[in-house]
UniProtKB/Swiss-Prot annotation:
Keyword Transferase attached: yes
Protein name from the UniProt record: Orotate phosphoribosyltransferase
Family: Belongs to the purine/pyrimidine phosphoribosyltransferase family. PyrE subfamily.
Alphabetical UniProt keywords: Glycosyltransferase, Magnesium, Pyrimidine biosynthesis, Transferase
Pfam family, one: Pribosyltran
InterPro entries: OPRT, Or_phspho_trans_dom, PRibTrfase_dom, PRTase-like
Swiss-Prot/TrEMBL catalytic activity: orotidine 5'-phosphate + diphosphate = orotate + 5-phospho-alpha-D-ribose 1-diphosphate
Gene Ontology BP annotations: 'de novo' pyrimidine nucleobase biosynthetic process; 'de novo' UMP biosynthetic process; pyrimidine ribonucleoside biosynthetic process
Annotated function: Catalyzes the transfer of a ribosyl phosphate group from 5-phosphoribose 1-diphosphate to orotate, leading to the formation of orotidine monophosphate (OMP).
GO cellular component: cytoplasm
EC category name: transferase
EC annotation from Swiss-Prot or TrEMBL: 2.4.2.10
Organism, scientific name: Bifidobacterium adolescentis (strain ATCC 15703 / DSM 20083 / NCTC 11814 / E194a)
Length: 231
C-alpha cells in the first residue's frame, strides 16, 4: 500500500534536513521548536522531488473539484518561489500531461531588453494563475504579490499551494494565516502537509539507529507551542 502524501512528504523533509528541531525565532518574533528550511532544497534532485510533490497535491485538488483543470501558469514569488514555480510546472507537464506555464516576478523593474516586472509566461486578461509558496507565517508575501499580478493583467488567481501549513493564528486574531488569506482574497489555500500531519508521521519514521525522528520530547514541545499559537 502506498503511503499517504503527507507521510511521504514528511520523509522527504527529514531526509533533506529541511525540517529542523530546536529553538528558532520566526519572522513573527515567536520562538518555535521546529522550523522548515526551504534552503535545504539546494540541488537538482531535491528541487525536482519538491516540484513533484507540489504537482501531486495540485492534481489531487483538481480531481477533488477544488481547483479548475485549466491552469494557465504557476506563479512563484521571488525569490524563494522561483524554483518552486518552475519545478512544479515541469512536474505537472512531465508527470501529469498538463500544459502549463510558469511565471515569477522581479524584485526590481528591468529597464532594458524586454523590461517589465514578470519573467516567464506573460500574463493576460482572463488567465488562471495558481500561486505556489513554501510556508505561510502571516500571508505577507501573498499580499505583496496580488497587486503586482493585477497590475499586469486582469488575471484570476485560482488558489495557493504551500509546502507546509504551520496552522498558527495571526498576531491580532485567533484566525489562522491560511484562513485569513482565504477570507481576504476569496481563493482556496492548500498545503502538501500540515504540522500536525508532519509530527504524526515523524513519530513513525525512524533514523538509521531505529529511533523515531520525532521523539516524545520533540512532540511535547510542538504540542505546547501549538497550544499557545495554534489556530
Amino acid at each position: 500500500m502506498t503511503a499517504s502524501l503527507d507521510h511521504r512528504f514528511t520523509e522527504f523533509l527529514l531526509e533533506s534536513q529541511a525540517l529542523k528541531f530546536g529553538e528558532f525565532t520566526l519572522k513573527s518574533g515567536r520562538k518555535s521548536p521546529y522550523f522548515i528550511n526551504a534552503g535545504a532544497f539546494n540541488d537538482g534532485r531535491k528541487i525536482a522531488r519538491l516540484g513533484a510533490f507540489y504537482a501531486e497535491k495540485i492534481v489531487e485538488e483538481i480531481e477533488a473539484g477544488n481547483l479548475p483543470k485549466d491552469v494557465d501558469t504557476v506563479f512563484g514569488p521571488a525569490y524563494k518561489g522561483i524554483p518552486l514555480g518552475v519545478s512544479t510546472a515541469i512536474a505537472l507537464t512531465s508527470a501529469h500531461g498538463m500544459e502549463v506555464g510558469y511565471t515569477f516576478d522581479r524584485k526590481e523593474k528591468k529597464d532594458h531588453g524586454d523590461g517589465g516586472m514578470m519573467v516567464g509566461t506573460q500574463l493576460a486578461d482572463g488567465m488562471k494563475v495558481l500561486l505556489v509558496d513554501d510556508v505561510m507565517t502571516a500571508g505577507t508575501a501573498v499580499r505583496e504579490v496580488i497587486p503586482k499580478l493585477k497590475a499586469e493583467a486582469n488575471v484570476e488567481v485560482i488558489g495557493l499551494v504551500l509546502s507546509v501549513d504551520r496552522m498558527e493564528k495571526t498576531k491580532d486574531s485567533d484566525t489562522s494565516a491560511v484562513k485569513a488569506v482565504e477570507a481576504e482574497f476569496g481563493f482556496p489555500v492548500f498545503a502538501i502537509a500540515n504540522v500536525k500531519e508532519i509530527f504524526e508521521a515523524g513519530q513513525r519514521i525512524q533514523n538509521a539507529d531505529g529511533t523515531p525522528y520525532v521523539t516524545p520530547e520533540i512532540k511535547a514541545a510542538a504540542d505546547a507551542y501549538l497550544e499557545q499559537y495554534g489556530a
